[in-house]
Amino acid sequence: MLLVDDHAIVREGLKRVLCPKGSDWALTEAETGFQALELLRTSEFDLALVDLSLPGMNGLELIRRIKTEFPAVRVLVLSMHAEEQYALRAFKAGANGYVTKDMAATELVGAVRRVVAGGAYVTASLAESVVRQLNGSAEAPRHALLTDREFDVLRRIAAGQRLTEIGNALHLSVKTVSSHKTRIQDKLQVAGTAELVAYALRNRIDDAFPEQ
């Protein structure tokens, strides 16, 4: 399996959990999405364990690239980000499972086994949330209407980044970022930056999207 995470201490800890002495699993490490794609092009992997907070190429984009170039590779997201903000976006990108880094080791191993075997892994709380939205007993939040790019811009605005900083980080012009901001405000039905930030804070979006 291929583990994609930019923190060495996290990779080492996961290696001890997933590949103890005598394990049948072998683990190859990558620090960035670009490095992961190069490894996938030169070696065969059954599973990619992908963190969402990756430098240069965020986890969602990496998942899409993997599923486009290597459709047979299973993808399990391993993230510090709350599933209620991010799991559905990961599944829409092509992920086969989503777990958080505070999950118990035995549960993580079980999730890996299920995804490698061809199944999907979702937590009970996420499954319940999806069912409640589908049967109408709970409404999807307004920010569910945002594209991944818009969601990223919203998170950055809420974190205090200026439009020029966002443009530099995402390789976009300030005009394009401003257009994204306008569409976000329309979708969230808020009037300006202050209301936009307040909405993000209420919905825990200020730290929900991975850095890039």
Identify the meaning behind each predicted range:
Residues 29-47:
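Acidic, metal-coordinating helix/loop segments flanking the phosphotransfer/catalytic sites
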Residues 51, 79:
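Active-site residues of response regulator receiver
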Residues 10, 55:
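The feature encodes the CheY-like receiver
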Residues 162-195:
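Recognition helix of helix-turn-helix DNA-binding domains
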